């Protein structure tokens, strides 16, 4: 069997979509195992840019694309995305949805907006797309699953009960107008007609493929440092975008996972609130942002930029049991002069070579850097590792040494062809 997992090692936006698109050329199945439409994945094919939110990044390839049990699905977003890529010539008949996946409802989106607007609450920086409230209902056992949509009577009963409870909150606590049951029910009946043929039990399908030694690529959204358990809590997402999240989010045994592929940007970025030890503020940080085009694929929000944090990198490598590292956007570092990588933190006079749990401690952390010589050459057309500038290779080799994990691919540009394959994944 061949189960490959691709995870982000930082705070997202590492370029997972591009790498998954490349790897999915030989994959029989590509499986999303967590998250929802709260993150954008950019895939560039022959200079043409595709921005995906909910669909697996491998949708542009021939392999079956699975939206797994651990994903939360907004049917409207799903159908809009299907329609958008079909209009550009892509086929989507190979996309299926787990009958165990939970459904994002209008009251989830409304609740998300309310929670982020309350003055006394910590501002997490949510995308306000209902992801967190949908996962909250899932854990509270109030959620509506895709399987419920296949039984209209059951869906009606669950929606009516949920909406009664949510409207109590909207009207009596927040003084808002109640949501209309009939409007929502009719809207979702329309969605059901368009997606019901895609709703299946994906667990036996994925496991059968693994048992038949087919290549199954598991795709995480967000990244390690946004994990609900291991990220910079509470500035995290509501699911587990780690290798361990595959077992619960896709329904496969950890024994069926052969490779853990960590995607790491050559510097570090973060969107929204939360601690960021290596953040570069001011003109130089803005320069990296401009060169790297560091703006959200979906929201357009500017990303905070900083030096490569290998305390975070080691943490991600260890927890995910990574077998391969993919370095992206190293071309952005060309011409920046001296480069820095963070190898430890100093907090209240104590040196940490790991990520502490306490967010307030991270806010006080001082990065301990190693400084390396940079390079000025344009590397975007280089195809062989040995053709990279000497200082670029030294940078990569030092990263590999600190992580104690081999770098297998180096991305030198946004197009799927702009990759240097050091060793086969």
Swiss-Prot record:
Pathway: Purine metabolism; AMP biosynthesis via de novo pathway; AMP from IMP: step 1/2. It catalyses: IMP + L-aspartate + GTP = N(6)-(1,2-dicarboxyethyl)-AMP + GDP + phosphate + 2 H(+). PROSITE patterns: ADENYLOSUCCIN_SYN_1 (PS01266), ADENYLOSUCCIN_SYN_2 (PS00513). This is Adenylosuccinate synthetase. The keyword Lyase does not apply. It comes from Fusobacterium nucleatum. InterPro entries: Adenylosuccin_syn_GTP-bd, Adenylosuccin_syn_Lys_AS, Adenylosuccinate_synth_dom1, Adenylosuccinate_synth_dom2, Adenylosuccinate_synth_dom3, Adenylosuccinate_synthetase, P-loop_NTPase. Plays an important role in the de novo pathway of purine nucleotide biosynthesis. Catalyzes the first committed step in the biosynthesis of AMP from IMP. One of its GO terms (molecular function) is GTP binding. Homodimer. It is found in: Cytoplasm. Belongs to the adenylosuccinate synthetase family. Transmembrane segments: none annotated. PANTHER family: ADENYLOSUCCINATE SYNTHETASE. Its EC number is 6.3.4.4. GTP binds at residues 12-18, 40-42, 303, 329-331, 411-413. Substrate binds at residues 297-303.
